[in-house]
Amino acid sequence: MNFTDSHCHLDFDAFSNERPQLISQCASANIHQIIIPATHPANWQTVLNLASKENYHGCNLFACLGIHPWFLEGLTIAHLDDLARAVEQSTGPSIENKSKKIIAIGEAGIDGGIAKQQDNLNQQIMFFNYQLALAKQYQLPVIVHHRQSHHYIIPLLKKAKLTAGGVIHAFSGSYQQAKEYIDLGFKLGVGGTITYPRAKKTINTISRLP
């Protein structure tokens, strides 16, 4: 059986000295597809460069482009315009090497844990909505970050009416919230939290899903 890692930040500097070895280990464990979400304009090109390598150490790497809510400080609407251009350039029919095409928008989302001030929350919502609009325009899935923010994210996803769904990264939440995401066409990413005995709500939720 072959597996896909739906969320791996292989582009981060922490992996620079051991990236080939890590990818080879993934291939040895039958993980042959790895999706790399971007987090900030500064790492878009690194993500695209990694995804351009075909069958890299036994794995196919796939790129996503987006802006993570943790990294909004100093960013403006101009950076969203840059994202729109980068997405257009990475999805156009003129691209000869299909591996250079992005497969999703993200990582995008809302983090209630850092939204201590209304201005920050408003910025997060603006950036998230913009990226949802890009996903709808290009019929791409969205890789969604959440923390203490289902009550913001679910209504925005309902309003966006996306056609390609996406993945709710490292889902933790109630059964009702999980069902709402699934009904919107999203998959739930399950991280290491599911192995923690204290994560009773998430364990119960996942066990009840089809």
For the regions a language model picked out, list residue spans one by one:
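Mid-domain alpha/beta scaffold segments of enzyme catalytic cores
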Residues: 1-210
